[in-house]
UniProtKB/Swiss-Prot annotation:
CDD domains: ATP-synt_F1_beta_C, ATP-synt_F1_beta_N, F1-ATPase_beta_CD. One of its GO terms (cellular component) is proton-transporting ATP synthase complex. This is ATP synthase subunit beta, chloroplastic. It catalyses: ATP + H2O + 4 H(+)(in) = ADP + phosphate + 5 H(+)(out). Keywords: ATP synthesis, ATP-binding, CF(1), Chloroplast, Hydrogen ion transport, Ion transport, Membrane, Nucleotide-binding, Plastid, Thylakoid, Translocase, Transport. It is found in: Plastid, Chloroplast thylakoid membrane.
Length: 498
């Protein structure tokens, strides 16, 4: 571990100050820097530009070397705005990659891509820093235990369960509830699971980042009185930041999570919202560096960049990183190269459906499109597996019958199919659930439903014991007992109206 020249202010060592270059060209966030012969910085080294602009404002811009162009010239990408920079300005080669603070002191704090706190609290009390570029763990260090990670969300736990120490993708277009689902998972896991979390806000809205911070303070995930008791570290590189910052902020969050896994030997949760913005930032940087674009205008290095990030998110013998990543799907097209490349790395996919959101069923998780490698009888048990398969079969049959219903109506179906449709509609509504983080919108208190309760509820619906209950009794409730209580209340209300 070394002193971080990008976050330690004026303390750049005398040795590092010797390797000075100067700016030869500036094109937006990309700088060309000339160094003396034989003193070229390495790829990924951090360069620091210090000085004053034309109105004597202090400038402190950190860049990362991306290309060695020849003729003692390097091309670097800035991690912050380049306003005020001029040709000829002095550039310091720090001699190392970007390094960020790690350890317990990061909990309860908000950082930018450089590991600088941006929450207006005291400086981070740690001398321990770690470089954001490092190799993935060796094969021999990996741990391959299979166990379920309970989330308390019915549709997830039953039909596409998450793996402890696995990678999970939340896929969906704009406005179908990816961020709300991530916030609910953070809330549930912080309450039901003792480990720490790291949240990487990659290229998303600043307002959402602020809302998340406020909600975490309200729920006690971030403890304002005793910040060291907090359970989460936040790293933000928002939409308004240059592409260099958005491309590297995921690595900053991952580096903090790796320290908790490798040194503190903890189970860590890493949330990334949104992994598509990481790809998008890489595409912008690739174009700025003059690379020829690949399919649909994406960077030719898309698979390499994604693999470099994803292979570091893994479980070792020391601890685990369970990663939950929101994946924006451009124009709801799952074959787009960005979501398609992400699919290859995931253990479970939670696909959000615009059709379900339009029906008002939240979380709008598509029960037939969502998948998990964990849904096998030898892992989850026979009862869970059988229930999940029967739920999927019932919903699939309902989907097949929808065209017939639309043209001929329900009356033309056989008795058996009518029963299947009635149960499928109850299942569809029972897959909805009130969220803790959505209490302000729905007015309903949030519900955490254990896996055993979830399985019991769906078995009762499938067995036909609840066929007499109205389908609206199953909408936005927690466990099955709440549904039967709601049905009784609805019946009483109807009797009063009569």
């Amino acid at each position: 571990m070394r002193i971080n020249p990008t976050t330690s202010g004026p303390g750049v060592s005398a040795l590092e100050k010797k390797n000075l270059g100067h700016i030869a060209q500036i094109i937006g966030p990309v700088l060309d820097v000339v160094f003396p012969p034989g003193k070229m910085p390495n790829i990924y080294n951090a360069l620091v530009v210090k000085g004053r602009d034309t109105v004597s404002q202090q400038i402190n811009v950190t860049c990362e070397v991306q290309q060695l162009l020849g003729n003692n010239r390097v091309r670097a990408v800035a991690m912050s705005a380049t306003e005020g920079l001029m040709r000829g300005m002095e550039v310091i080669d720090t001699g190392a990659p970007l390094s960020v603070p790690v350890g317990g002191a990061t909990l309860g704090r908000i950082f930018n891509v450089l590991g600088e706190p941006v929450d207006d609290l005291r400086p981070v009390d740690t001398g321990t820093t770690s470089p954001i570029h490092r190799s993935a763990p060796a094969f021999i260090q990996l741990d391959t235990k299979l166990s379920i990670f309970e989330t308390g969300i019915k549709v997830v736990d039953l039909l596409a369960p998450y793996r402890r120490g696995g990678k999970i993708g939340l896929f969906g277009g704009a406005g179908v509830g990816k961020t709300v689902l991530i916030m609910e998972l953070i809330n549930n896991i912080a309450k039901a699971h003792g480990g720490v979390s790291v949240f990487g806000g990659v290229g998303e809205r600043t307002r959402e980042g602020n809302d998340l911070y406020m909600e975490m303070k309200e729920s006690g995930v971030i403890n304002e009185e005793n910040i060291a008791e907090s359970k989460v570290a936040l790293v933000y590189g928002q939409m308004n930041e240059p592409p260099g910052a958005r491309m590297r902020v995921g690595l900053t969050a991952l580096t903090m999570a790796e320290y908790f896994r490798d040194v503190n030997e903890q189970d860590v949760l890493l949330f990334i919202d949104n992994i598509f913005r990481f790809v998008q930032a890489g595409s912008e940087v690739s174009a700025l560096l003059g690379r020829m674009p690949s399919a649909v205008g994406y960077q030719p290095t898309l698979s390499t960049e994604m693999g470099t990030l994803q292979e570091r998110i893994t479980s070792t013998k020391e601890g685990s990183i369970t990663s939950i990543q929101a994946v924006y799907v451009p124009a709801d097209d799952l074959t787009d190269p960005a979501p398609a490349t992400t699919f290859a790395h995931l253990d479970a996919t939670t696909v959000l459906s615009r059709g379900l959101a339009a029906k008002g069923i939240y979380p709008a998780v598509d029960p037939l499109d969502s998948t998990s490698t964990m849904l096998q009888p030898q892992i989850v048990g026979e009862e869970h597996y059988e229930t999940a398969q029967r739920v999927k079969q019932t919903l699939q049959r309902y989907k097949e019958l929808q065209d017939i219903i639309a043209i001929l109506g329900l009356d033309e179906l056989s008795e058996e199919d009518r029963l299947t449709v009635a149960r499928a509609r109850k299942i569809e509504r029972f897959l909805s659930q009130p969220f803790f983080v959505a209490e302000v919108f729905t007015g309903s208190p949030g519900k955490y439903v254990g896996l055993a309760e979830t399985i019991r509820g769906f078995k009762l619906i499938l067995s036909g014991e609840l066929d007499s209950l109205p389908e609206q009794a199953f909408y936005l409730v927690g466990n099955i007992d709440e549904a039967t209580a709601k049905a009784t209340n609805l019946e009483m209300e109807n009797n009063l109206k009569k």
